[in-house]
């Protein structure tokens, strides 16, 4: 098996982001974005995705957290895409149904090469601590488009905003872990087109 890891940097006038990902890791993480709740969610994603993740970000959080959260999504998506290489032998599809107390979240994804997000995640509160919850959608969209994954995130039940978001990040990690896993029975690209 090839060493499925990647390092990506993104520097703009608004943010300076470094992401390193190792798809065949064991859930180790080192995350510092300057956005506390977001850091917590990225750590959960790495742990439940069993991927090793480093994220270092500096951004214009004195304005708000939008640029940092979105740009981390962009850079993480590019890192995962690069780490996957030509996608030979991967399972390709992944899904997870994750309970978090009263909330129940479904994530399904396809490493299709076609970035797309379908989000049905009504969040009761506009903020969790200092975190603007509308940024969850911005992160998922940036990740999906830059990774080239079709991503569906759906809340089946839930009342507590923290629980709903946490369930979504855990489910994303578990679904991605499944999708990027190697299937020993497959020798090529998991598509009749021969390319993803």
Curated annotation (Swiss-Prot):
Gene3D superfamilies: Imidazole glycerol phosphate dehydratase, domain 1. GO terms for biological process: L-histidine biosynthetic process. InterPro entries: IGPD_sf (IPR038494), ImidazoleglycerolP_deHydtase (IPR000807), ImidazoleglycerP_deHydtase_CS (IPR020565), Ribosomal_Su5_D2-typ_SF (IPR020568). Keywords: Amino-acid biosynthesis, Cytoplasm, Histidine biosynthesis, Lyase. Its main location: cytoplasm. It is found in: Cytoplasm. Its EC number is 4.2.1.19. It catalyses: D-erythro-1-(imidazol-4-yl)glycerol 3-phosphate = 3-(imidazol-4-yl)-2-oxopropyl phosphate + H2O. GO terms for cellular component: cytoplasm. One of its GO terms (molecular function) is imidazoleglycerol-phosphate dehydratase activity. Pathway: Amino-acid biosynthesis; L-histidine biosynthesis; L-histidine from 5-phospho-alpha-D-ribose 1-diphosphate: step 6/9. PANTHER family: IMIDAZOLEGLYCEROL-PHOSPHATE DEHYDRATASE, IMIDAZOLEGLYCEROL-PHOSPHATE DEHYDRATASE HIS7. Belongs to the imidazoleglycerol-phosphate dehydratase family. This is Imidazoleglycerol-phosphate dehydratase.
